[in-house]
Amino acid sequence: DLINDNATRFFQDGWIVVNDLGNSNRAEFIPKAECIKRDIFGKGRFHEFVNQVPHGSRDDTHGCVRMYYRPFLVNGEVPKDLYFTVVDAYKVDKAQKDVTDKHSLYSAQVWMRSNTITPYPNQKLLVCEYIGRLDTMEQNDIVTMGMCLMYNAECCPEAGTGETVSNFIKYKLRRYLMLDPTNANTRKLTNPNNNDYGIVIGDGDKKYNGLR
């Protein structure tokens, strides 16, 4: 089983916390062993990555952050626009203990754009992801904030679902919100000050572009 074979494992599971949230906003990735040592989740436990989607009624839906590739640095900094984050949120808060297989999970993925500066040129790569569900949407969004801070990545949520936009603004991270990329040309011509963050997954071409 390659998933459980440490010799073939190139990813690292752990958790992301944001220190001094709303002020200096410093993100930290904490590997699994360190999470257990520091008792991040209590009772010396660790929440494993959610591999089963859709999940079962008895599955642990807390989840963890899986990092496939660490942020690529140039002169000690992550280049702007090298990465972007996409978020698929849920619509209603529910305590984690009450989540069943009837409820959606939260998903956040960091992608590296095709580029010519990294060891993986001319390809789009998934570099980090989280799947799970915490007690509140805000708690889930804070995990995404940590991803965006670590990878210097703008966040593209599904507009009209969840609280991602309002939570990023609440914690002074508006600069990490991505304007609707499907409206880029229209925005330049008609309303350059339009702040439509994220993508609305609608119907027809709009749905296709949003999913793409």
Residue ranges and their predicted role:
Residues 1-188:
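RNase H-like, metal-dependent nuclease domains and their acidic two-metal-ion catalytic environment used
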Residues 171-212:
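Metal-dependent DNA phosphodiester-chemistry modules and their immediately adjacent helices/loops
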